[in-house]
């Protein structure tokens, strides 16, 4: 089966997805409708993105109003909405400083740079990362370098050096990889692509304690498991700990390309400064 839309897409786009033979036309709530009028209950939610459903009128009206007013200026200028959005994220994360991005992968890249800059400014000489086996953090070069899934990594190696991989939920495995060059430990509190693996309380608290004792930063990637998907706003909040840096995206925007990374004030004091990092579209109104 091949209609004009599929044919046009297949002839023009790079083939990086094996797409279902369905051409979607519109959505309403939790349902999607194709060009032939068939109705589908959507369990995928756009890869954990469509948190408010399809055709959400309140969201649509807000978007229309802002587009008519102003939708991009760059981060060289203040605008009327970015600060409020950042304050909202501070409130729900308990973090102190926010940086807006265009995607989850970009947010993860920011967390890695923030950790490296912190170590650089502190003069520790640390640069290595410990990540988890079967993790997924994104497809850009830095994010892929801390992704512990060989089929995704193999075609692009060598990747960023200085990354080692521990067994998930195995604190001894993590401890065995710590050196005086370890800059940060990055993990998903709930692994998605790795098989819906939930971190144990012992593991999360153990990582936090290890980081505190060894002068290592703890990074939690909440791009997929965050925004209320596990009973708390962010999964790490269920463990009674707080990471130093975190990433988020997907369900924040309900399909609008927005993500963010956040950090504590202590990290921000010694981390990214003007000239260290940027984004062309991130944080636009």
Where are these regions (language model features)?
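Conserved N-terminal phosphate-binding loop of PLP-dependent enzymes in the Aspartate aminotransferase
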Residues: 1-285
């Amino acid at each position: 089966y091949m209609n004009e839309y599929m044919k046009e897409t297949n002839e023009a786009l790079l083939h990086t997805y094996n797409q279902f033979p369905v051409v979607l036309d519109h959505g309403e709530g939790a349902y999607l409708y194709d060009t032939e009028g068939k109705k589908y209950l959507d369990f995928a939610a756009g890869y954990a993105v469509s948190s408010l459903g399809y055709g959400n009128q309140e969201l649509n009206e807000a978007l229309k109003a802002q587009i008519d007013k102003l939708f991009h200026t760059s981060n060289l200028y203040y605008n009327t909405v970015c600060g409020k959005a950042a304050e909202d994220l501070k409130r729900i994360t308990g973090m102190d400083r926010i940086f807006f991005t265009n995607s989850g992968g970009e947010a993860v890249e920011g967390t890695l740079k923030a950790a490296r800059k912190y170590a650089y400014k502190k003069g520790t000489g640390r640069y290595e990362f410990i990540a988890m086996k079967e993790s997924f953090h994104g497809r850009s070069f830095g994010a892929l370098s801390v992704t512990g899934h060989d089929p995704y990594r193999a075609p692009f190696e060598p990747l960023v050096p200085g990354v080692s991989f521990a067994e998930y939920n195995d604190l001894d495995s993590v401890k065995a990889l710590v050196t005086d060059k370890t800059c940060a430990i990055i993990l998903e509190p709930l692994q998605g692509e790795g098989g819906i693996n939930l971190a144990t309380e012992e593991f999360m608290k153990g990582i936090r304690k290890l980081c505190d004792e060894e002068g290592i930063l703890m990074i939690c990637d909440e791009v997929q498991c965050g925004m209320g998907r596990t009973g708390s706003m962010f999964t790490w909040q269920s463990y009674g700990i707080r990471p130093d840096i975190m990433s988020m995206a997907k369900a924040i925007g309900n399909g609008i390309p927005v993500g963010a990374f956040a950090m504590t004030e202590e990290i921000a004091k010694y981390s990214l400064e003007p000239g260290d990092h940027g984004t062309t579209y991130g944080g636009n109104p």
